[in-house]
Curated annotation (Swiss-Prot):
This is Prolyl 3-hydroxylase 1. Transmembrane segments: none annotated. Its EC number is 1.14.11.7. The lineage of its organism: Eukaryota, Metazoa, Chordata, Craniata, Vertebrata. A motif (Prevents secretion from ER) lies at residues 736-739. One of its GO terms (cellular component) is plasma membrane. GO terms for molecular function: iron ion binding; L-ascorbic acid binding; procollagen-proline 3-dioxygenase activity. It comes from Mus musculus (Mouse). Belongs to the leprecan family.
Amino acid sequence: MAVSERRLLAAMLAVAAAAALRVAAESEPGWDVAAPDLLYAEGTAAYSRGDWPGVVLNMERALRSRAALRALRLRCRTRCATELPWAPDLDLGPDPSLSQDPGAAALHDLRFFGAVLRRAACLRRCLGPPSAHLLSEELDLEFNKRSPYNYLQVAYFKINKLEKAVAAAHTFFVGNPEHMEMRQNLDYYQTMSGVKEADFRDLEAKPHMHEFRLGVRLYSEEKPQEAVPHLEAALQEYFVADEECRALCEGPYDYDGYNYLDYSADLFQAITDHYVQVLNCKQNCVTELASHPSREKPFEDFLPSHYNYLQFAYYNIGNYTQAIECAKTYLLFFPNDEVMHQNLAYYTAMLGEEEASSISPRENAEEYRRRSLLEKELLFFAYDIFGIPFVDPDSWTPEEVIPKRLQEKQKSERETAVRISQEIGNLMKEIETLVEEKTKESLDVSRLTREGGPLLYEGISLTMNSKVLNGSQRVVMDGVISDDECQELQRLTNAAATSGDGYRGQTSPHTPNEKFYGVTVLKALKLGQEGKVPLQSARMYYNVTEKVRRVMESYFRLDTPLYFSYSHLVCRTAIEESQAERKDSSHPVHVDNCILNAEALMCIKEPPAYTFRDYSAILYLNGDFDGGNFYFTELDAKTVTAEVQPQCGRAVGFSSGTENPHGVKAVTRGQRCAIALWFTLDPRHSERDRVQADDLVKMLFSPEEVDLPQEQPLPDQQGSPEPGEESLSDRGSLHKDEL
């Protein structure tokens, strides 16, 4: 049988299979033969006349019909692409021999367009007449806005289907978070008997986004073991969603309004226009899949961020093989990321060079990147030659993918935009300066007056306030605990570490020049209960954290109680052989409740940052070591505004926001021990371990044993503290595992 005959037979079989696919789809339970636009119109008409069962019937059918049509498009395009791929011998690249033989060139074109026609025939037979599956742009927008659920929640409520009403209302509100009426409806539903928390379901939730957000939440709660399966599931669902999104891009050409009246193009220009539009749509899937209705902007670098979360989560559970695989995969997208290279080097050292070298990046990520870069090359080429705009949704695209002429044009446009922005910015700064000069003095007085509440306990003294520390919402106090208490808590840390503190005595991947031991309040109490550490030391640890919480709450004159967000007693020890020419820090400058971008002078308050943290404190247990000073900076992470030297019984407290970037200098000799505490004003984010610790303390001790010393009616600490013998440069510092 000739090659052409075999191709024709394959095409006929594919078209027949496509027709069978449509018949099979129409016989499925979810298929509704009526068009979604007609069903939606019937539903709105039923709503107008108060026919609530009619609203439910038609709106539910409209949603099912639209979902079935979407599924049919996906199946047809996937099936036809699989059954009728481009012919293996169809070389689409330049062939010098074709220019010498016009007949061969014509045959080449015919083979190409023959493949196109056969694919089109397959799709036509599978999808059916175009009129059967086209929705108007306006109606598609209504479905995307989740409007059917707005009608459904009222109708369900009217016919006493409360569980469905709650789910429909919640689904609509997730897509329309500014809709005040629906917010009021949801508040009302929450007060009704019989309504459960599980009823508030998003019926349109995207599986990949649901798993990602759940995984990130568990990651932020420092539960890496539980976060990993959700982040891995998010990746699997992402690639499925990406293929579906891309398949749906292969629709009719969008003429953009009435442009079709003036559209005039030859064969190849028309093909180019349509294909580039399809490629643009496919690249835009990056943005679509990274978007969530509750966010103003999509997640930045959404796919690579999965591997970033996973590499550190796997490290935290001791799985270096997977940590290396995810780190290498992340580096496919950002090959110059210094921190990731440091992490990879650390993981490699822990696993072994030979075994680590055999681990490759994930294959599906490599394929994704290769395909995406090829598409970008075509899109940038079309932008450069035909002027068809393309906005790259990714920040990881290598510069060499963009044509040089286009690079120069974009550079010129950026420089112009920057110049205009700077001129506007300078003008705004002048105006702001005039306003600030008038308000700054009164604001400073207000802040200082607000701070300076009682220190509650005898022996505690104010060492530095916000004014001395050159900032706001900052304080350093001494005498919080005694020398004996410091030594006992230090012994507790080292004893708990030998009993298993969850870190296995290893160094952090970010600070390979130090090792650390740590123990939480709950862990210490459990070890005390088991007799592995002195129970009274664990009780002291619990009491001291409560003492610091009360003092911070009082000093900053907070109207709302502080709740523990996380508590950690940790010791960091310098590794002697690793200190030569050391330039790193125990922890670089950061902000406790947002992601600091020092270059842009901004801090993004979103996960994985602990956005719910409001105040932070660190209580030092010793000062007999070198380095390890705590320091505050400006948002640029370079300009140091104050520095604090640790010593026994000294506490540093501050608000956790952008006003207080801070870091920790390297510990170059000895061991630095401290209790790190984070607090929240939101009881919903109260530390679960603390609640368990409270219950365990009640079980193990009598009320008299856990009562703190009587709070003293001391005067407010409003004035500037008396300067001590130390200068600002002699005072204290910290790390993510601390502050």
